[in-house]
């Protein structure tokens, strides 16, 4: 749900929930980046809602640790420090390895085809941000293919923290090519129903992503 559109299409959801989901998606997609300021009146105007559901959504974002009060009015999107980043990737390695293992056992033919289509989109992407979008969809497809609602829920929570990382690792030299190769090998392991290999490849993929992330952080 784009952050600059109204919430008319969010039928069946309380307005506060729809507003929260719109803001969370804006964070995940990089519309709002670490350090950006969110103001009630601006968000309300963009989403065409009153300030009451925005205030409710802001409270949930604060409770989840995604934003912090800024000086003056509004909230600031948090930026993770290096310790938090290392902890986040350690958890990603465990959970995404488990998701890949389960996907190798449960993924359907159409789901494997969807992974291949997403990887083709990643390969053809012309910008780092576009690669990041396909990458997120790729990983979410694996989460869904795991057939484990609790694991999927935990991984979705991590997606919120990933939104606080800032610049995509696909801006690091040679990382897009390496990530494409890692994704391709992971797809083949899932397609072959090789759970051990899929787990190991997913974990290695996250470790390589962490190395690229730390390079970005060292550059400042």
How would you describe each model-predicted region?
Residues 165, 212-213:
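Membrane-embedded alpha-helical segments of multi-pass transporters/permeases
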Residues 98, 105-168, 180-189, 197-207:
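Conserved amphipathic alpha-helical segments that form helical-bundle/coiled-coil interaction surfaces
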Residues 1-105, 214-220:
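Short linear motifs at protein or domain termini
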Residues 36, 68-69, 135, 178-180:
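Short, flexible turn/loop "capping" segments at secondary-structure junctions
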């Amino acid at each position: 749900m784009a952050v600059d559109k109204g919430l008319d299409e969010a039928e069946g959801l309380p307005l506060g929930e729809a507003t929260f989901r719109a803001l969370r998606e804006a964070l995940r997609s990089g519309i709002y980046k670490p350090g950006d300021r969110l103001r009630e009146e601006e968000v309300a105007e963009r989403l065409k809602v009153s300030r009451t559901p925005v205030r409710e959504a802001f409270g949930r974002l604060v409770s989840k640790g995604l934003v912090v009060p800024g000086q003056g009015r509004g909230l600031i999107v948090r930026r993770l420090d290096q310790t938090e980043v290392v902890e986040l990737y350690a958890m990603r390695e465990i959970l995404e390895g488990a998701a890949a293992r389960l996907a190798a056992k449960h993924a359907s033919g159409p789901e494997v085809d969807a992974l291949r289509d997403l990887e083709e989109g990643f390969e053809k992407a012309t910008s780092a941000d576009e690669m990041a979008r396909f990458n997120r969809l790729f990983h979410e497809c694996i989460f869904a293919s795991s057939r484990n609602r609790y694991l999927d829920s935990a991984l979705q929570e991590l997606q919120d923290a990933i939104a606080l990382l800032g610049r995509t690792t696909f801006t690091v030299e040679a990382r897009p090519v390496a990530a494409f190769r890692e994704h391709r090998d992971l797809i083949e392991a899932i397609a072959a129903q090789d759970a051990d290999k899929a787990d190991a490849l997913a974990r290695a993929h996250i470790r390589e992503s962490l190395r690229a992330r730390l390079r970005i952080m060292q550059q400042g």
